[in-house]
Amino acid sequence: MSYYQQQCNQPCRPPPVCPPPKCPEPCPPQVWPGPCRPVMCFEPCLPSVWPGPCRPVVCYEQCPPQPWQSTCPPVQFPPCQQK
């Protein structure tokens, strides 16, 4: 099972071609104040040391559209590994 299938439990989607900008909202390095809420980051924020049950991992297709997505050329990615 690929990383994206395992994390999202959805059909695989290719990652963004261009380097994504900073997170739409700041990603706390260690402490996430208040109740758990999704972090709309294209890369998870320190999932291995994330405190508590919060899971900031978000599928790429669930992230809000970014301006660079319309200008980046598409790139072919290998098909997802099925197990």
UniProtKB/Swiss-Prot annotation:
Coiled coil: none annotated. Signal peptide: none annotated. It is found in: Secreted; Secreted, Extracellular space; Cytoplasmic vesicle, Secretory vesicle. Forms five pairs of intrachain disulfide bonds. Sequence repeats lie at residues 21-29, 30-38, 39-47, 48-56, 57-65. One of its GO terms (cellular component) is nucleus. This is Small proline-rich protein 2A1.
